[in-house]
């Protein structure tokens, strides 16, 4: 039964090939997880080890020889090589742009808070918009231990109210968007020393006057100094523009009592922001309010509060960015696989000849990977540079936790560019690995016959 033995041999070879492929995929998956977590220092160590291996070992020098031949022919395969470069550039560009949006939004809100100021909301409130603090509670909060006092001896505390109004956007005057109006007390300026009037003047208490943030001025129609606005059925005058370089740039500020009266909020407030004597005084302040039976409030530092406000949207943007990037990366991997399989097929005789004269499989595999990852590196650098050029500092707006527009800038940080490069190199590695392994495993006689 010779044929039965042949069939068993063929089946065994196929099974071994399947197991080898499965093992390769599993190793690849583990490698990608490790690669995603590697810090720049570890990547630098790996790169140094690769360079030393290429320069100081026999197989390394063989790898350089094979890689040099392949890289020298890239110009002859310009169209196919461009598919890899442009595909990976697209992946990196989309990924970095999406992550830059999330990082910019998060940075804007995190800059709003500090560790030496605290915000008090009604217990169980996630944001100012659904918080209410009665008038009797306001003085209790302001007089709590740990609250700093100003030169006049009064607590540095600002009871505030936050309401939402609709204004036409400059990008589309026919469409309205939400803008946050914040009613603040006299101490609001002391609490937030970064808020500076850059045009006009501050509002006067008791008058229907507003100062607007630079971000809101850029986004909405009719907020120039001297303009009249109709809000809550009343005429308001814009008397100044302020710069805060945080989320307050998206707001309109007015006198707390005047805003509360216009929107029929009575004598209540929605939040109280205080300056602490020191960041260490926060625990004392929080403990005093938590133990007071007259109060049922949530207390947090303003840094903690605004960081929490950014977490939800930042998480969504990150998930969407990684999902879209992954889908595009799969397409780029198939493009790289197709290109490199074609390149290997065209060079089958050359690779077979090298192996026949003593070149082992490892130099062939590494050489093909070096060629693919060089193209991937070019694509990653191109995608990162174009994204930085277009999106870094780009101004956008989105709905914040108070259902009002928050103006922020995209932030293409070095960390995001590094993430994009790691994605590019991972795509190049996957796209080159399987063609490289095939080239190394293909029997010399078969390669010579096929070519």
Regions found by a protein language model. Give the residues of each.
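N-terminal Sec/SRP start-transfer signal
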Residues: 3-23, 50-91
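Peri-transmembrane interface segments
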Residues: 15-30, 105, 278-334, 343-345, ...
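Short helix-loop junctions at transmembrane helix boundaries
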Residues: 21-44, 381-422, 433, 437, ...
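Hydrophobic alpha-helical transmembrane segments of multi-pass inner-membrane transport and secretion
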Residues: 78-105, 314-350, 373-382, 430
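Hydrophobic, regular-secondary-structure patches
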Residues: 89-180, 199-201, 206, 287, ...
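Mechanotransmission and gating elements of multispan inner-membrane complexes involved in transport
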Residues: 168-176, 221, 225-237, 241-321
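Short beta-strand boundary microenvironments
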Residues: 175-219
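Transmembrane alpha-helical interface segments in multi-pass membrane proteins
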Residues: 341, 349-395, 419-427, 435
């Amino acid at each position: 039964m010779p044929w039965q033995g042949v069939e068993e041999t063929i089946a065994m070879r196929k099974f071994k090939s399947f197991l080898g492929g499965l093992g390769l995929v599993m190793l690849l998956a583990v490698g990608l997880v490790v690669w995603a977590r590697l810090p720049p220092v570890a990547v630098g160590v790996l790169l140094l080890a690769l360079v030393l291996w290429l320069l100081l070992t026999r197989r390394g020098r063989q790898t350089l020889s094979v890689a040099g031949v392949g890289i020298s022919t890239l110009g002859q395969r310009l169209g196919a090589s461009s598919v890899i470069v442009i595909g990976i550039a697209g992946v990196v560009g989309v990924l970095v742009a999406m992550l830059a949006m999330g990082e910019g939004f998060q940075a804007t809100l995190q800059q709003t808070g500090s560790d030496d100021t605290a915000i008090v909301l009604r217990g169980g409130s996630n944001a100012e918009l659904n918080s209410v603090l009665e008038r009797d509670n306001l003085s209790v909060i302001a007089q709590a231990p740990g609250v700093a006092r100003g030169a006049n001896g009064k607590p540095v505390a600002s009871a505030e109210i936050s309401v939402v109004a609709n204004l036409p956007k400059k990008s589309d005057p026919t469409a309205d968007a939400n803008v946050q109006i914040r009613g603040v007390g006299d101490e609001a300026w002391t609490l937030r020393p970064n808020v500076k009037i850059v045009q006009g003047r501050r509002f006067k208490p008791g008058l229907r006057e507003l100062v607007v943030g630079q971000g809101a001025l850029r986004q909405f129609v009719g907020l120039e100094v001297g303009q009249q606005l109709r809000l809550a059925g009343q005429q308001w005058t814009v008397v100044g523009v302020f710069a805060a370089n945080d989320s307050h740039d998206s707001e309109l500020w007015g006198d707390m009592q005047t805003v509360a009266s216009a929107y029929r909020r009575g004598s209540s407030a929605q939040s109280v922001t205080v300056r602490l004597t020191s960041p260490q005084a926060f625990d004392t302040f929080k403990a005093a309010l938590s133990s007071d039976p007259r109060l049922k409030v949530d207390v947090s530092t303003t840094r903690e509060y605004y960081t929490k406000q950014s977490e939800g949207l930042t998480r969504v943007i990150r998930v969407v960015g990684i999902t879209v990037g992954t889908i595009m990366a799969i397409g780029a991997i198939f493009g790289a696989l197709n290109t490199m399989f074609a390149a290997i097929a065209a060079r089958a005789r050359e690779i077979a000849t090298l192996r026949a004269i003593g070149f082992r499989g490892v130099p062939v595999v590494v050489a093909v990977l070096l060629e693919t990852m060089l193209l991937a590196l070019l694509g990653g650098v191109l995608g990162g540079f174009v994204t930085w050029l277009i999106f870094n500092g780009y101004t956008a707006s989105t709905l914040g936790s108070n259902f009002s527009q928050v103006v922020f800038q995209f932030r293409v940080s070095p960390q995001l560019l590094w993430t994009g490069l790691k994605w590019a190199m991972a795509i190049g590695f996957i796209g080159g690995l399987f063609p490289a392994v095939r080239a190394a495993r293909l029997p010399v006689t078969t390669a010579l016959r096929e070519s």
